[in-house]
């Protein structure tokens, strides 16, 4: 037997017999330290032992035979040394797992690691330095072990979830050094479908996912919370940290899992603030990733469209009952903008366009657009020549008729700060028209459906400047271009509206068309580009 393996055997004997002589621990720590340094600095030695099953079996034997939970009556010095020696074994395993993760997985060392750490909590303080160092080392070992594939053993899920729950028990100030290895391993785990299925049903999932990761790590250690809350803009100049990137990848994986749907529904019904924070986070994730496969797109659209459809019905009832309630409108508006923004981003994929059409999403979009058209006021702020200070406001109804300064204007606009309230659902019409434009592009069938569903006229009506929906004029004109292209029925429909002065000549010109009167007096549109 090699000298190195004898070191491991001696450590096994010491830990299993639970000897309380401090000098024995110091002697073994010195020998183990040399072995650890060699595996860290010498690739050949590391590769040799990482592929050796006997070495891994010795490590497993040490871990299985250790009884850290039985040393509570010992002196603080020996408890410290026992945990330190145990940590040294995990450091060695961490180094070897870089090249030998397959053998470690075969031996199910992750299950043993969870159990050992959970048992170690029975001895000493939660926040002592060695306890935290042991946790961080085990996390790094588990991450290295999961580099090629992730193993999730359902029979050890209770031990695993208890292991993951450890940082929640600490004062947050003590968790700083474990955050990165914790997030790395957590990201590894959620790549396993079964883990995420059971984790999202774990009774303490909120304390980990929302309390620790979303509320503490994301708020205090990441820029993501600032981006989600709107105090920081995503731009090429923003350098995302390692923690930022891990968090985004983590929630990208969560967003595409089937178990996320019932979890979101539960948060909407029981913890609305958490629900909105999650939804805003998913909005950030989805709108900043350009590569999704069809399965992932279907998963995202399933929960997005479900929330949108339910919320659209609630918005219709809100206006039907003339509620004018700022608290209710704030919730409805947030869900509406987020889901529409996600759909607008994902509409670049043909798969998502087909999804929306197959679920009669076009009907729902046009119906909601008409509700907004009938109930929202159009807002135009008067600004200084520098376009910075707002000096006044003009509000009109859907017909362009100026509204007097009555209670409706005060319900929809904060006249003191000159800001539009959520009660006027800002940016919702804009996003709907953007989605319709993408669905309509070079699709004759959808062009016709938009007309038949009553969408063509209302889109024409939005080819105007409206501060409630910035750039809605430009988006509407683009949508009209797509609706009229090579579509005689739509062109005749718009020509008829123009004859009644419902359509605007300037709008048609910007869309690339003009009214043509034939010799027999019939109106039609012709392209100005011909």
From Swiss-Prot:
Domain of life according to the entry: Eukaryota
SUPFAM superfamilies: ARM repeat (SSF48371)
Predominant place of localization: cytoplasm
Gene Ontology annotations of biological process type: cell division
Sorted UniProt keywords: Cell cycle, Cell division, Cytoplasm
The keyword Cell division appears for this protein: yes
Function: May play a role in the regulation of cytokinesis.
Protein name: Ataxin-10 homolog
